[in-house]
Amino acid sequence: MVLGVVGISYREAALKERERAIQYLQSFEKNLFLAQRFLGKGGAFIPLLTCHRAELYYYSESPEIAQAALLSELTSQGIRPYRHRGLSCFTHLFQVTSGIDSLIFGETEIQGQVKRAYLKGSKERELPFDLHFLFQKALKEGKEYRSRIGFPDHQVTIESVVQEILLSYDKSIYTNFLFVGYSDINRKVAAYLYQHGYHRITFCSRQQVTAPYRTLSRETLSFRQPYDVIFFGSSESASQFSDLSCESLASIPKRIVFDFNVPRTFLWKETPTGFVYLDIDFISECVQKRLQCTKEGVNKAKLLLTCAAKKQWEIYEKKSSHITQRQISSPRIPSVLSY
């Protein structure tokens, strides 16, 4: 009975490969028989799907078989995943949650993404003690590491890179912006731009949008309206927008379209003309070119988190052993234990 993870991140895989991985791993949530096929009876999983990584954390009573089956299936789809089991799985999630494995060293958004993935999995499926322990300890250690060590206040962020791009295309504070969707990244970019004097911001979302932004209902949305820059950060696909097409996007001269979605909102067969289209990989490359992080700082962070992971792994092994003994004597035990 072992915990494991298979997945890919921005380090190993381009956007197209991450899209395929996300679409495949999403199928586990839609079809629980698929999960049982790979993980076996009693198997459980939590997907962690973000713009920059697609991972499946799993529990299986036949870990070697489960890992081999998952790797084989992903490889057959042109995906080259990494994999970790046991202590290595703990160490990996601890480093991911702390932000030291992120595109921007120490960024805080990943902590929330890990927490939401865990809560979603807990709400939708019965999870074993093992996955609860792994995620709760990763969130705890990640938070403690941030408060104890602290990270540098980065000058380079996705938001600042977006502003640089806008300036390079001669977009001013009088530019009209449309944000489609109320995702984390859309909110962060909008807040950053507003703080820097870009006040002509409109949101179109099914969620409630807070001030100071203007809002637009889906019924009145038209991509032929004079928005100079459009940001897509919605969970909805392009087919769900009746007026969305290459022609409607190109209807406004010199328009810029940022596509933050993964999988992307658009899968162009050819590079579109009539407007500038920038996806999340383009933004990520711009961020990486501007970032400077010392190797010494990264190695120190990895060492500290590896030690924390080893400590929690040893605790997990003891608790897991006790649970196994209790299962032998009593078939009914709580699915979530306090520790």
From Swiss-Prot:
Catalytic residues (positions): C51
InterPro entries: 4pyrrol_synth_GluRdtase, 4pyrrol_synth_GluRdtase_N, GluRdtase_CS, GluRdtase_N_sf
GO molecular function, one term: glutamyl-tRNA reductase activity
Enzyme Commission no: 1.2.1.70
Site, as annotated: Important for activity: H92
Residues annotated to bind NADP(+): G181, Y182, S183, D184, I185, N186
Binding positions for substrate per the UniProt entry: T50, C51, H52, R53, S102, E107, T108, E109, Q113
Functional pathway: Porphyrin-containing compound metabolism; protoporphyrin-IX biosynthesis; 5-aminolevulinate from L-glutamyl-tRNA(Glu): step 1/2
GO BP: protoporphyrinogen IX biosynthetic process
Keywords, sorted A to Z: NADP, Oxidoreductase, Porphyrin biosynthesis
Catalytic class of the enzyme: oxidoreductase
Reactions that this protein is recorded to catalyse: (S)-4-amino-5-oxopentanoate + tRNA(Glu) + NADP(+) = L-glutamyl-tRNA(Glu) + NADPH + H(+)
Assembly, per entry: Homodimer.
Family to which this protein belongs: Belongs to the glutamyl-tRNA reductase family.
Miscellaneous comment in the UniProt entry for this protein: During catalysis, the active site Cys acts as a nucleophile attacking the alpha-carbonyl group of tRNA-bound glutamate with the formation of a thioester intermediate between enzyme and glutamate, and the concomitant release of tRNA(Glu). The thioester intermediate is finally reduced by direct hydride transfer from NADPH, to form the product GSA.
Record note on domains: Possesses an unusual extended V-shaped dimeric structure with each monomer consisting of three distinct domains arranged along a curved 'spinal' alpha-helix. The N-terminal catalytic domain specifically recognizes the glutamate moiety of the substrate. The second domain is the NADPH-binding domain, and the third C-terminal domain is responsible for dimerization.
Its biological purpose: Catalyzes the NADPH-dependent reduction of glutamyl-tRNA(Glu) to glutamate 1-semialdehyde (GSA).
NCBIfam families in UniProt: PRK00676.1
Protein name from the UniProt record: Glutamyl-tRNA reductase
